[in-house]
């Protein structure tokens, strides 16, 4: 089975085509990448979105195809795409990983299911959907854009944009919703901008 290793990750596919002149890589057929936490270069960590749930577990990326550009340090996974770490799951039509900065983006029907803990330590399922997502681990910031919708045990919220600041070690520190914000809870509703 063809495979390549880079930056703490192992990627397998049915076929890899490497263009030496342009330094690009294409993976075809089912593509799977395994990122092992703690390995040199293994900077992406899905558990940061869910209070560190599954932090020591590998990140698995599954896609239909892969395009890599060595000079740009970028890998683009084409869909349908699925990423799993522990019980945390992220799906989208496309994933893009910047290997040098560890930044990550997803687009086209982004859906994430993350497990967090509230102030009393009670586990809570946090589901979010949007059209685009950007994650910057250096700044510990995440942004969901376009048709954002979140669902928890406490209710449903929709907005144009949702910005999150992550605590060091994982978990959300702050969420800021902007643009056509609507909050629905069992006992009341609210709207705002």
Language model feature labels by segment:
Residues 1-193:
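Mature-chain termini and adjacent capping regions
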């Amino acid at each position: 089975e063809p495979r390549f290793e880079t930056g703490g990750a192992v990627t397998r596919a049915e076929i890899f085509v490497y263009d030496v002149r342009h330094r690009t890589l294409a993976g075809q057929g089912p593509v799977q990448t395994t990122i092992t936490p703690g390995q040199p270069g293994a900077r992406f960590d899905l558990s940061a979105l869910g209070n560190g749930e599954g932090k020591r577990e590998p990140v698995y990326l599954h896609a239909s195809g892969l395009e890599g550009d060595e000079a740009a340090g970028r890998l683009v996974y084409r869909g349908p795409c699925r990423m799993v770490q522990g019980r945390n799951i992220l799906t989208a039509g496309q994933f893009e990983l910047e290997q040098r900065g560890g930044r990550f983006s997803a687009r086209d029907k982004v859906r994430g299911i993350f497990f967090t803990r509230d102030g009393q330590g009670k586990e809570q399922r946090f589901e979010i959907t949007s059209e685009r997502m950007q994650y910057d681990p250096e700044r510990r910031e995440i942004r969901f854009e376009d048709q954002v919708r979140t669902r928890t045990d406490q209710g449903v919220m929709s907005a144009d944009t949702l910005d999150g600041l992550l605590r060091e070690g994982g978990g959300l520190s702050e969420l800021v919703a902007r643009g056509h914000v609507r909050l629905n809870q069992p006992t009341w509703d609210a709207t705002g901008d």
